[in-house]
């Protein structure tokens, strides 16, 4: 199925020199600690918490509406420590997600309304289905599908997952166009 054009109002997004498109309705706390490596889309009502620890997002990533990206923490006897969050290239995070992972590899798809628990590790080329809740410190192996509450293994992905995710994220970016007056 071919993706149609996704038009947005140019005044509602900030476009950086490296091609990132960030909604003015999103909240980036501690923006000096947030690195978007290029051609990444952050849609309206998203929250990225760079004030807690560094957040690095790779190239050609999409973070859809109302998602929260927050670095993981660990409780110690003397308090709480936050750790950096690394997200790879060509990662697609759907609407209404809460991501509290330690690491998300490249070529990963996170479905709608998911909760990625504290300090989870999502390896390259994996998929989390809609409405999945991953418990804290879950490791999702490459080429697997996780679903349910709690999130458990439910299937495998083909070897071409990397190419498919590159295709999806690049075409989404190319079709995400400013609305021009006719």
From Swiss-Prot:
Keywords, comma-separated and alphabetical: Acetylation, Centromere, Chromosome, Cytoplasm, Cytoskeleton, Kinetochore
Modification N-acetylmethionine occurs at: 1
The keyword tRNA processing is assigned to this record: no
A family per Pfam: DCTN5
Location in the cell: Cytoplasm, Cytoskeleton; Chromosome, Centromere, Kinetochore
GO cellular component, one term: cytoplasm
Stored InterPro entries: DCTN5, Trimer_LpxA-like_sf
Assembly and binders: Subunit of dynactin, a multiprotein complex part of a tripartite complex with dynein and a adapter, such as BICDL1, BICD2 or HOOK3. The dynactin complex is built around ACTR1A/ACTB filament and consists of an actin-related filament composed of a shoulder domain, a pointed end and a barbed end. Its length is defined by its flexible shoulder domain. The soulder is composed of 2 DCTN1 subunits, 4 DCTN2 and 2 DCTN3. The 4 DCNT2 (via N-terminus) bind the ACTR1A filament and act as molecular rulers to determine the length. The pointed end is important for binding dynein-dynactin cargo adapters.
Function (record text): Part of the dynactin complex that activates the molecular motor dynein for ultra-processive transport along microtubules.
Record family assignment: Belongs to the dynactin subunits 5/6 family. Dynactin subunit 5 subfamily.
Protein known as: Dynactin subunit 5
Organism: Pongo abelii
